[in-house]
């Protein structure tokens, strides 16, 4: 069984027991979180597609950890001016383990 849900402006296809990285959620590690914006649920033979969301659909997950992603380097370079700016960015994420899918 798998589901497609929406979190942090992105869509994620998940199955039970899978670990996925989402945009940062303000929930402590070890706590449970529910996602209600379910776009699609499939159990192999039945497929429920929401318009836009599946009514009564729910994905439950347990927060594993919070962290920061890999560094993305931003370089601004002006030719012939001896001018260069370098910056970096590391996006915060929350890693969750999917514990249940219901439709």
UniProtKB/Swiss-Prot annotation:
Specify whether Ribonucleoprotein is a keyword of the entry: yes
Task: Return the Pfam families for the record.
Answer: Ribosomal_L21p
One of the record's GO cellular component terms: ribonucleoprotein complex
What NCBIfam families does the database record attribute to this sequence?
L21
| PANTHER family, alphabetized | 50S RIBOSOMAL PROTEIN L21, LARGE RIBOSOMAL SUBUNIT PROTEIN BL21M
Job of this protein: This protein binds to 23S rRNA in the presence of protein L20.
* Subunit description: Part of the 50S ribosomal subunit. Contacts protein L20.
Name of this protein? Large ribosomal subunit protein bL21
